[in-house]
Amino acid sequence: MSGKQVYFFAQGQADGNRDMKDILGGKGANLAEMAGIGLPVPPGFTISTEVCTRFSQKEEKIPAEVNEEVLSNLKKLEDLTGQKLGDEQNPLLVSVRSGARFSMPGMMDTVLNLGLNDKTVAGLARKSGDRRFALDCYRRLLHMFGDVVMGVPKRKFEQILQGKKKKLNIEYDYQLSEEALEELLSEYKKLIKQETGKDFPQEAEEQLFMAVGAVFKSWNNPRAITYRRLNHIPQDLGTAVNVQMMVFGNFGEKSATGVGFTRNPATGVKELYGEYLINAQGEDVVAGVRTPSPLKAMKEEMPEVYDELTEITERLEKHYHDVQDFEFTVQEGKLYMLQTRDGKRTGLAAVKIAVDMVEEGLVSQEEALMMVEAGALDQLLHPVFDAQEKKKHEVLAEGLAASPGAATGQVVFLAEDAVSWQEKGEAVILVREETSPDDIHGMNASQGILTATGGMTSHAAVVGRQMGKPCVVGCDRIKLNEKGEFFQIEKKRVKEGDWISIDGITGEVLDGQIKTKPSAVIQVIRGELKPEQSEVYQYFTKFLAWADKVRKLKVRANADTPEDARMAFAFGAEGIGLARTEHMFFEKKRLPFIKEMILSEEEEERRKALDKLLPFQREDFYDLFKEMKGHPVTIRTIDPPLHEFLPRKEDLMVKIAELKASKNPEKKRIRSLEKLLERVKALSEFNPMLGHRGCRLGITYPEVIEMQAGAIFEAACQVVKEGGRVYPEIMVPLVGAAEEFENQKQVIVKAAEEAMEKHKVKCEYSVGTMIEIPRAAITADEIAKQAEFFSFGTNDLTQTTYGISRDDGVGFINHYLVHGIWKDNPFMTVDQDGVGELMRWAVEKGRQSRPDLKIGICGVHGGDPRSIFFCHQIGLDYVSCSAYQVPIARLAAAQIALKERQQGGK
């Protein structure tokens, strides 16, 4: 280790600045910055993150040269303040706090009031004129130091404290008398001796170095490790340690402590927002022991301090070009700034603040785009619960928050019931063990979806996000009875028709009916509000228009219906990246014909059934083309195995048994069901998702692809004849070999030529493939000789690369994440080293064969900001995601383009 490792700061002077977060951590860098620009900051020094790394490597010892540097800076602090650490007459007290590069609130350790001992406590009492205050500070030090530094369980201090309060019949700490505090000091010191075999150190310098070591050590405590894993923070950064002169807000009626924001973090309104308490310590604001006052009230109680705070916070916001979250203390009328950092805010506030700051001339449009987390835009699109109403309802259970928004409705357990109830005007929540593709109609009819099993990429989760439906999955406290009549949560039974509410932002399941309200953005898109009536919508569209100026990636939407397409287009989608034809088959009127086709044993019979389906498909595609107004529409030919369109084998067996056991068995009905059961058994596969599906189905049943392609081009030609523009892209799924693609392309091209000949019009189109199995990626150069575009189906590409079913993997994926086997869930964020390497290879090889090859992504990863960054880096042309994720993708694509520009890229 070489060079400077300890950095001093005081009002008007600082060794560091805000650009040194890697060295000083976020807290230390901002303290240095505030001090450097002349703000009233309690003086102190920061020990660098590099020392933390060295500390971990050197058997948890602070290097000798760093100790010397610490003592040198301590002397500087003592000279500046006129106080001395450990001095009995005028003791210097300091806080020792962590501060990593990225904010990790509450994850690491802090020690306050360091420097107190049996002698200096008397000096503090004389100096403050308040012996009780001094004793309480010492009590807090023993508690924190004993826990953080000496390893005495915190609960043991709490037990002593609670016992004392119970004995004295008091409720709050501030009610403890001087005598009671002296007794607690004695008991705390005895506890430390009993637990550690050592006395509490009376030497102040010894306390300091022990506390610094403990804070470094806390970088690797379990909660900090977990927090970094969950928030994608590298584990090897280390924390800095900030040693700072203590200031006290509980020195009397001219002292106070508080926290605040330079703008309202919930609404974005430009106002000083926060709370403070007179004659209190910072932890009292957080603990709620006393009700704090709004900062505005300080204007009356402490007008001079309020004016100074207003001036300082306005200066901070202009200096940092962002909303600031600040902490302050007033000691005997003097204001001290303890911390500033960029303020966390809601999605609504984030967009308003970004736009307002551009219009105020505070930031550029490009800077504004980097101020909003892409995922936060979700909050502007989904219905939300009325906050006050929600507080009145019991939380029954919690699951995974799979699709955001708020929904309230009556419980139903079957998709068919959801539809019938909805047709009667009822609002319903569909509750299932898990959902499958044939539940689509019921999911669509529901206000929200709740499943007992499944993960963030389960069918319910993916479809819920696509539909914009609130969805909670993996709620394992819910036990459905076998007949599907009710579900049980411990002693509470919830029956069909009972009202529940689900919160797709928190994952909570609540009892009863809670009032919801749609977002203003959605109200405008639906035509329920005019754009000029919604300030939120105006901010939303203006902000995203800036994003569109800078992004390179196109953004499309996964949409199967005209309604989906209409919503996607309103959200700014530039085409449809995935239209799943099989979802169109599940409509009630069509299911009989698809079943007829599946049950037919001869090709001629199948063609007759398909002829009945063709008009439906043609109408579907016509409506999609009309909605997209000439933008590309990528249509995937049939993908799932045929058995998914038929009833489950077990359900059929039960139904047949019930019919046979009835008093008047319907023989014709029984024979029909038995024939259906035989076909279901014949189509059954051990591993259907790797079986007879995708292009394999199209090759063995070419008449299905002929019908679908015919319907596509009949619809396209009709639009052209009407003077419209259309550009269909037909996508062949599950291709693993160039020969498979060539086979299907021939069928599609023939259908296109026949339709154009019939209608005497020309229609531009292209034929491409999904890249969703490793062999397709590896042989991309061969496939690209025939395919005009690729689209990565990353859901299946991840499954086939890992050899893991995304639904069956739920049971152990979380275990992998918790234990650090994986850093991320590969079904939510592209695994760049494995799946991503296959994608990179496919892009390079594909464009070697066809330089103008268009390449996109249509898996669930298309709406994940970090995956979008990767897609930009490897040169994709577009991403496709659910309609409600289109705004997120537009912003994420802009942000990666800006980052690339900042780093000197093109």
Language-model region placement:
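Nucleotide/phosphate-binding sheet-loop regions of phosphoryl- and nucleotidyl-transfer enzymes
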Residues: 1-393, 420-422, 426-429, 436-438, ...
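C-terminal accessory/binding modules appended to enzymatic or scaffolding proteins
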Residues: 18-19, 403-445, 551-553, 835-851
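Short beta->alpha connector loops at strand-helix junctions that form conserved
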Residues: 45, 452-454, 473-476, 579, ...
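Conserved alpha/beta-domain cores
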Residues: 97-98, 521-523, 529-906
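Long, charged amphipathic helices and adjacent flexible linkers at domain junctions
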Residues: 228-233, 369-421, 426-428, 508-551, ...
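Structural motif
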Residues: 242, 412, 429-431, 450, ...
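Glycine-rich phosphate/ribose-binding loops and adjacent secondary-structure elements
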Residues: 334-336, 436-444, 450, 456-462, ...
